[in-house]
Amino acid sequence: MILSYAYYLCSGYKTVVFILLTTIVTFTSGILLERTEDNLDKSLKADGLAREDKKALKEKAKTYKKRVVVLALLLVFGVLAVVKYHNFAIENVNGIIKAFGGNGRISTFTLLLPLGISFYSFQSISYVIDVYRGKVKACNNIFKYALFVSYFPQITQGPIGRYDRLAPQFLAEHKYDLAVIQHGLQRMAWGLFKKFIIADRAGVVSDLVFNNPGQYHGIYVIIGVLAYCAQLYGDFAGGIDMVMGASEMFGIHLDDNFRQPFFSHSIGEFWRRWHITLGTWMKDYVFYPFSLSKAMNKLGKFFKKHSKTRFGKYMAKALPICLADLLIFFIVGVWHGAAWKYIVYGMYNGIIMSFSSIMAPVYEKMFKITHINKTARWYRGWQIIRTFILVNISWYFDNAATLTDAFLSLIHISEPTRRSYI
């Protein structure tokens, strides 16, 4: 923990208050949740309690626990929203004021952005929710918990850890093992190769094209996005390799964050292979709670009741999933940055996944009519190529300076090549 905080202080001592606040809030929340559950168990074991009394005690405890979780969410994500997205919000408010003919303008201001705040915020909130669900026991030692939140190899770019997998490793005895250290160094070296040989070299080409969206057309725009694809993967996956290699040298095994994403057969599979820990976080803490919520259940029943066609009944099941996908990828877009281009980037992926879910019965019918073998090698190859193309289209929104530049680059793909060099 001392080493992790020393590393964190190197990025600036002024921002350490944010990680301390997150640590204290989520640690305290875990203790309160655990204590409430223990007190409930003791109360329920008391003699002479009627069934109604037990039910009332359970409801009271459940309400209190929900309030603790909501308060933790508001505090942790509230801080994240303020420090990371305040100027984006102000700029949009100013745009609305101007659109309605107003002359007033709210001034933007600069706040220090704490190192790794998105990662440790998500990681610490997962702990609170897991304690609430009874998946893990609350940690009763704030120093041990602080290590989980601040573990230095992963704090800058992940992977997003889970308490039930990391805490036992932190508490376990680790002996010197030369083979483990060598393997960790090898993985770090592989990460350095991806970063400095692949990503940095590809970045020269992608920067040239994306920094001058009006100058390059045709094949050069495609070359630019392919270079960015290599740059992004080399930079991100290489960084993760270095993180995991360094952590492995300490005897701590982190969750995989990449699994050959460019061999995916669909956008959904791509996101199960790319930034895996973010995807599983969204699945466990957003997708399932939202898609299985009372509101989505009522929506599904409404469609089922008022739909007379087979497709309508299918939509009763598919719609909650589609809406959950859209919500997840809206959050993923916001996660990537405070700009509309990132929101469009996220929604692009969400719309494709939702559309695929809605059209699944239609696709199945087409396969039967055309007698296409979905397991055939040629078809599987086509799926990989199709997914790769769709993914690379999304990179235009991710890497362009503005949303306008992204659309400009996409338009220029269909235009004749005007540059004789790159």
What is each residue range found by the language model?
Residues M1-S414:
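Membrane-embedded transmembrane alpha-helical bundles that form the catalytic cores
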Residues E415-T417, Y421-I422:
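Positively charged, low-complexity/disordered segments
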